[in-house]
């Protein structure tokens, strides 16, 4: 997960990067509870104002294909449900019998493979760039790789 940090306050929080799953609410900070959303585009101004609690690790291409609302109207929230997309259901993996749960492996943040992954995102060496871009690491493009693996017998 992309994480923000305020070292002086000793606080950390998950960021509104593409694929983040967060809890929606009304104006009252304590009004959330039943509606969730998936961040489609980096919405960093929402950091620390709405709670991110998960991320999409598979199928984001389907989420990105959803119809979008006009940002000038209700901040892009589609007001006519029949014009939007409908999610017919979801499965909470923890509720599945253990032998039916998908198994995912994420890269550990220690060691050379992680350091190389981070370097490759920061240092752009592709022949595409006829002008070398600055060495920067965009936190929202820096997701830890995850892959689905066969369940252990």
Predicted regions, residues:
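Cross-family detector of peptidyl-prolyl cis-trans isomerase
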Residues: 1-153
């Amino acid at each position: 997960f992309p994480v923000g940090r305020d070292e002086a306050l000793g606080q950390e929080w998950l960021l509104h990067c593409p694929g983040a799953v967060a809890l929606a609410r009304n104006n009252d900070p304590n009004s959330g509870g039943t509606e969730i959303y998936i961040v489609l585009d980096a919405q960093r101004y929402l950091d620390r104002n709405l709670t991110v609690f998960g991320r999409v690790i598979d199928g984001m291409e389907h989420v990105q294909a959803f119809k979008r609302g006009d940002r000038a109207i209700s901040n892009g929230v589609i007001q006519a449900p029949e014009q939007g997309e409908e999610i017919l259901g979801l499965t909470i993996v923890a509720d599945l019998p253990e032998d039916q749960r998908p198994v995912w492996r994420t890269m550990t943040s220690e060691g050379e493979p992680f350091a190389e992954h981070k370097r490759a995102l920061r240092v752009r060496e592709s022949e595409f760039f006829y002008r070398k871009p600055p060495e920067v690491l965009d936190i929202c493009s820096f997701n830890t790789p995850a892959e689905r693996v066969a369940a252990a017998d």
